[in-house]
C-alpha cells in the first residue's frame, strides 16, 4: 500500500507515519512547505490519503482560508489525476458548532468537511471523517495548542504553570487510540463519519494536580499505581516523554556492611515486568522503541552504555553505567534505545523493569538502529 499523509510533520502525522511504515506501507509525506505540484504528484500514486493538514491557531479569516484551502487543494489534485482513492480526514468536534464550539475554527473545519464530502459525491471516492476532541500523547508541541503538552513540559522541569478555568472539563483521546481509529477508518467502504472511542474527561484543575503528583513521586523513586491501559497510565507515559535528559537518571543510595551492599531500586505496589539481561562484551541489545511502554534499566554487573535518541531526531544521548556506581536510567516512550557492553572481558548484567507485560499480539516494539 502507498499512503499519502498531509500534515505529516505534525503531532498526529508523525505517529501515523510511523504506524504506517511499521505495517509495511510506503508513505509519502506532505507538509506545509511543499507545493501543489508535489501534492499532485503524490496524489497520482496514492492508494489512500490521510488528510491531517490544517490550521488551528490563527486569525478567524486565516483559519477559514487555511483549512478550507487545504481541503480544496487536495480534492483538486485528486480530481486532476483522476484518482478516486479513499480519503481519511481528521476534523474536530468543534465542527458541530454546538455551544462553545460555535467559533471560527469550528466553522472552518465544517466547511472543510463539506468540501471533501462534495468531492466524494462527485468522484465516487470514499471520504471518512474523524471528528476528534483534544488529543494527547508524546511528541505533542508544548505552549501551542495542547494544555496536556504544555503542563507536562513545564511540570517535568519544575516550572510554574498557569491554571485557568480550573472547572472546565476537557475531552481527550490518547494518540494511540487515534492512530488505531485512523487505520480502522481506512477499511471503511462508504463515506461518512467514523466512530471513535469514548474520550477521557477531566477538569483542567484535576489535570494539573495529577501531573504535579507525578513530579512529586519522581524525586522519591516511587512508581504510581497505574492500571494498564487506563487514562492515568497513558497520562503518566505522556508525562515521562517530556522529561529533560537530566531527569532520566535516578541516583540511588548504597548501604554497605560486612556482608556486602544493598540498594533499593524502586518502590511499587503493583504492575510491570522485571527481567534480567546478560550482554556479552561488545554486543548491543535493544535497538528499538515503544509507543507507550516505558522502562528502567539498572546495571548490576559489569559496565556499559545506554544510548537514547528521540524518534525522528539525530541527537544521541549517552549514559555510561557501571555496577560500581549504582544508577538507573528511565527509557521514555518514543525514544530509540540500545544497551552496549563496553567491557572487554566481562558480561554486562542489567535488571530491566517494563511498565507493561510483554504481549506478543501487541508488542509495542519497533525496530530502529541507533
Question: What positions do the PLM features span?
Answer:
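N-terminal Rossmann NAD(P)H-binding glycine-rich loop of SDR-like oxidoreductase domains
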Residues: 3-19
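NAD(P)-dependent short-chain dehydrogenase/reductase
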Residues: 117-129, 133-170, 175-186
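Mid/C-terminal beta-alpha module of Rossmann-like enzyme folds, strongest
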Residues: 184-252
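Short acidic-glycine-tyrosine-enriched beta hairpin
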Residues: 311-333
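Conserved Rossmann-fold NAD(P)-dependent oxidoreductase catalytic core, especially the SDR/UDP-sugar
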Residues: 69-113, 118-123, 127-128
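NAD(P)H-binding glycine-rich loop region in Rossmannoid oxidoreductase-like domains
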Residues: 34-84, 94-100
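A short glycine-rich, His/Asp/Glu-containing loop-to-beta-strand
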Residues: 246-287, 293
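Double-stranded beta-helix
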Residues: 313-314, 342-370
Amino acid at each position: 500500500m502507498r499512503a499519502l499523509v498531509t500534515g505529516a510533520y505534525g503531532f498526529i502525522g508523525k505517529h501515523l507515519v510511523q504506524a504506517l511504515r511499521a505495517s509495511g506501507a510506503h508513505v509519502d509525506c506532505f507538509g506545509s512547505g511543499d507545493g501543489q505540484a508535489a501534492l499532485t504528484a503524490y496524489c497520482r500514486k496514492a492508494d489512500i490519503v490521510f488528510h491531517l493538514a490544517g490550521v488551528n491557531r490563527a486569525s478567524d479569516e486565516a483559519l477559514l482560508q487555511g483549512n478550507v484551502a487545504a481541503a480544496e487543494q487536495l480534492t483538486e489534485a485528486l480530481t486532476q489525476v483522476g484518482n478516486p482513492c479513499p480519503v481519511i480526514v481528521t476534523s474536530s468536534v468543534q465542527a458541530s458548532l454546538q455551544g462553545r464550539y460555535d467559533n471560527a475554527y469550528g466553522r472552518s473545519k465544517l466547511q472543510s468537511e463539506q468540501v471533501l464530502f462534495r468531492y466524494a459525491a462527485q468522484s465516487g471516492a470514499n471520504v471518512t471523517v474523524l471528528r476528534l476532541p483534544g488529543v494527547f500523547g508524546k511528541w505533542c508541541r508544548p505552549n501551542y495548542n495542547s494544555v496536556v503538552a504544555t503542563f507536562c513540559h513545564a511540570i517535568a522541569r519544575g516550572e510554574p504553570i498557569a491554571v485557568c478555568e480550573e472547572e472546565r472539563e476537557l475531552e481527550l483521546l490518547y494518540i494511540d487510540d487515534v492512530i488505531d481509529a485512523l487505520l480502522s477508518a481506512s477499511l471503511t467502504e462508504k463515506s461518512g463519519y467514523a466512530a471513535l472511542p469514548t474520550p477521557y474527561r477531566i477538569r483542567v484543575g484535576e489535570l494539573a494536580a495529577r501531573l504535579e503528583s507525578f513530579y512529586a513521586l519522581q524525586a522519591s523513586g516511587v512508581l504510581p499505581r497505574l492500571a494498564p491501559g487506563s487514562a492515568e497510565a497513558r497520562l503518566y507515559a505522556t508525562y515521562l516523554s517530556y522529561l529533560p535528559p537530566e531527569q532520566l537518571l535516578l541516583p540511588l543510595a548504597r548501604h554497605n556492611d560486612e556482608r556486602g551492599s544493598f540498594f533499593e531500586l524502586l518502590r511499587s505496589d503493583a504492575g510491570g515486568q522485571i527481567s534480567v539481561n546478560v550482554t556479552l562484551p561488545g554486543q548491543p541489545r535493544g535497538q528499538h522503541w515503544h509507543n507507550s511502554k516505558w522502562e528502567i534499566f539498572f546495571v548490576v554487573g559489569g559496565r556499559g552504555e545506554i544510548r537514547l535518541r528521540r524518534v525522528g531526531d539525530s541527537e544521541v544521548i549517552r549514559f555510561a553505567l557501571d555496577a560500581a556506581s549504582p544508577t538507573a536510567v528511565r527509557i521514555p516512550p518514543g525514544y530509540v534505545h540500545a544497551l552496549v557492553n563496553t567491557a572487554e572481558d566481562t558480561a554486562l548484567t542489567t535488571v530491566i523493569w517494563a511498565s507493561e507485560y510483554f504481549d506478543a499480539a501487541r508488542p509495542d516494539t519497533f525496530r530502529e538502529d541507533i
